[in-house]
């Protein structure tokens, strides 16, 4: 193997919008800002819900609902 070809790892902080701060090793070398993390993501917190924006499900069922019925 060749010597000195791998990037240097540095410990950085990844900060989430919920305020959670995570220390990780990375080659980026600068702090990261996350939108969601394991502490606030709906899948991991169990608060998962379906959001119907603008009645899209009703609009779909109105257009194609009759096709599924026999």
From Swiss-Prot:
Check the record and name the InterPro entries matching this protein.
Ribosomal_bL28/bL31-like_sf, Ribosomal_bL31, Ribosomal_bL31_A, Ribosomal_bL31_sf
Disulfide bond sites: none
Name what cofactor the protein needs: Zn(2+)
**What keyword terms does UniProt attach to this protein?**
Metal-binding, Ribonucleoprotein, Ribosomal protein, RNA-binding, rRNA-binding, Zinc
User: For Zn(2+), which residues are the binding ones?
Assistant: 16, 18, 37, 40
Question: How are cofactors bound according to the entry's free-text note?
Answer: Binds 1 zinc ion per subunit.
Entry superkingdom: Bacteria
GO annotation, cellular component aspect = ribonucleoprotein complex; ribosome
Q: Which GO terms describe its molecular function?
A: metal ion binding; rRNA binding; structural constituent of ribosome
SUPFAM superfamilies (UniProt xref): L28p-like (SSF143800)
What PANTHER family does its record include?
A: 50S RIBOSOMAL PROTEIN L31, CHLOROPLASTIC, LARGE RIBOSOMAL SUBUNIT PROTEIN BL31A
Task: Please give the function described in this protein's UniProt entry.
Answer: Binds the 23S rRNA.
Q: How does it assemble?
A: Part of the 50S ribosomal subunit.
Per its UniProt record, what NCBIfam families does this chain match? L31, PRK00019.1, PRK00528.1
Give the UniProt family note: Belongs to the bacterial ribosomal protein bL31 family. Type A subfamily.
UniProt protein name: Large ribosomal subunit protein bL31
Q: Which organism is it from?
A: Shewanella sediminis (strain HAW-EB3)
């Amino acid at each position: 193997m060749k010597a000195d070809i791998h990037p240097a790892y540095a410990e950085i902080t990844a900060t989430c919008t919920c305020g959670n701060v995570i220390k990780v090793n990375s080659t980026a070398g600068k702090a990261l800002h996350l939108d969601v993390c394991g502490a606030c993501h709906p899948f991991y917190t169990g608060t998962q819900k379906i959001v119907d924006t603008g009645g899209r499900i009703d609009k779909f069922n109105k257009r194609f609902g009759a096709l599924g019925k026999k």
